[in-house]
């Protein structure tokens, strides 16, 4: 069960997508909230669209059990059966970047389920194909090595740590070309209202600058 229904998810996603991550970062700072800016990752594609979604957390680590190669990986099964519209995959790969936590097939499956994007401190492969999907991603690296034999999913729907930020299930993730901002679900309304004030002020200043330059 999710905290918000589809209509509520759409409201928050569409409203947060109106703002750059810089406005959200400033809003959280103004409100005295802990920084939600994720550090140390990069956009898969500098031209990827701005996106927002609710954290669907997955924690992975180097595989300790044998994989028989027959069944779906646990990550694929979670994507196929537990994701829904408005989710944004958040995969903590315990800093492993020598192995790809996923690729184009998993991204396609997620996109078809209504997932808005992916955030991981691990690596991905099939980068060109994922970029062609217009599936927004922030990641820690790239690797052609597949994960099935070497990594396993050990937890889902738990708090994870990525880029210095604790991300809890249902936190809102906003990603654009500048970076990633995480807004705790308990503070969605106040952060959004503060971001509106910040953007309105910036727009007024920009208008004054343009008038002065004309």
Task: Describe each region flagged by the PLM.
Residues 173:
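C-terminal binding/interaction regions
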Residues 179-181:
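Channel- or pocket-lining gating/hinge segments that regulate access to a cavity or pore
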Residues 2-169, 183-213:
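Feature captures the catalytic cores and cofactor-binding loops of soluble hydro-lyases/lyases
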């Amino acid at each position: 069960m999710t905290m918000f229904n589809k209509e509520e998810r759409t409201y928050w996603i569409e409203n947060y997508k109106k703002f750059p991550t810089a406005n959200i970062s400033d809003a959280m700072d103004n409100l005295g909230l802990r920084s939600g800016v994720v550090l140390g990752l990069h956009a898969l594609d500098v031209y990827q669209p701005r996106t927002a979604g609710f954290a669907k957390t997955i924690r992975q680590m180097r595989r300790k059990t044998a994989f028989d190669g027959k069944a779906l990986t646990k990550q694929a099964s979670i994507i196929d059966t537990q994701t829904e519209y408005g989710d944004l995959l958040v995969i903590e790969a315990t800093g492993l970047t020598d192995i790809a936590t996923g690729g184009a097939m998993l991204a396609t499956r997620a996109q078809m389920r209504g997932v808005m994007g992916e955030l991981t401190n691990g690596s991905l492969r099939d980068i060109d194909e994922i970029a062609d999907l217009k599936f927004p991603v922030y990641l820690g690296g790239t690797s052609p090595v597949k994960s099935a034999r070497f990594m396993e999913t050990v937890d889902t729907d738990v708090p994870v740590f990525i880029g210095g930020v604790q991300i809890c299930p249902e936190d809102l993730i906003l990603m654009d070309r500048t970076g990633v901002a995480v807004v705790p679900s308990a503070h969605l309304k106040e952060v959004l209202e503060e971001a509106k004030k910040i953007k309105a002020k910036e727009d007024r200043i920009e208008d004054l600058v343009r008038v002065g330059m004309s």
